[in-house]
């Protein structure tokens, strides 16, 4: 098992470019199954989850060609449906959370898919109800195979209809959209997720010949078409990586410029960091973060403690709360971090407490952080990365800490961050992979 050894106290300086968005590209790659024609995708990140999904499509018979450093083409003109029925396919699906988004396109184009419960982060319950209920309303049939421990999902014909989702699930909405684009008639999805990832998926599908309206809202209308065609698509920069770099600069008192961030697609992320006292400046499509000795957390107008809580888009993404929690440990003031959407993502705070942070874990969803205002530096220590986002938060803490830290299970970080130690070391960090 690989690990990072981090020498804390190094300040960073220079420019850094965010990778392509992981949460977008997983959907986009699955959508290539909807056509037999060639689809070319630009700005594909070289990370474990994406590489594993690409390999899974290869094993399904999709022709995958790497055409450049971050450019791939996919042509699903000879999908091996026997392999999709095999135990080998189910085993791969069970290891990869992103494979859940194969259901919609496979059902929409081929009318059948077997599916094992997926893996991924251990961050609490992640229901598939929204996916399955939406697909059921389109006409899918579900059976559970006890022997294979897998769902058998079939559809003789998918028909569009109105549906009100019980939660604005990003992957659930994506699956329903991909199944509905070639269903007969009109599908209306209310309480649809509207993250930039979903907007990108819808725009790509429209370029392929789909008829989706209401993009960027929570009310989508999809007119089914007979077939989809090939296209080219460029993945957005990863907003989670952009936020991680902002937090990293603040914690290490560094001056960095984050290049080509697609600022208009960051939502309230920049403002949420500003509420923690972080100075940042938009320069065209870049973000400049100056060196900052102290930063002061805002209070609410009535003087009560600031609360940062996640919410469906355009609210604050849950994927950055771990980073914001770490940043708050060296701020002046206090903040309540409220992780509403997952119940186990705050369980890494004991590792920060061991490093000297002042954090009160109220319950599985809430933690109060009392900032040190840099009067006491965090101490280096040994820790393990429980999931992608906690892993990068621990890395940020270790980079700002006094002494040497060791983070194990860094495969979790590799799932979401491309060549992270190499890119940070080029800015002056002291990170060694062992």
Q: Where are the model-predicted features located?
A:
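Short, structured segments at the rim of ligand-binding sites
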Residues: 1-434
